[in-house]
């Protein structure tokens, strides 16, 4: 029993040291001419920290990502008219399903990109912490 406790204590020390030694790495991604899905997958990988050698699923990577020119990204196919973003208020008749065009008019390209990236993050307590490290400019 004591051996396993010592192992866990050592692992915790290593985690803390890794986090202290990591410098915040900043990425700037220009979205001009790139497709929505390609940008989203690249950013999701960076935000999770999967491209670093010290990747741990339970630790938020010390990274910041800035996406510029979001309004100049390419949206291929007929997604503008056919893609729908659903949200439900919880009340009868409270299901809203605006198309991509309607969301862009109301909230901008930032919302589209953020939703795509959010869908690629794990659905747990780390998701909001990871998404805080993302900045999108139109």
Question: What feature does the model see in each segment?
Answer:
Residues 14-115, 121-125, 135-138:
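Ribosome large-subunit tunnel/peptidyl-transferase-proximal elements
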Residues 128:
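Basic, nucleic-acid-interacting segments
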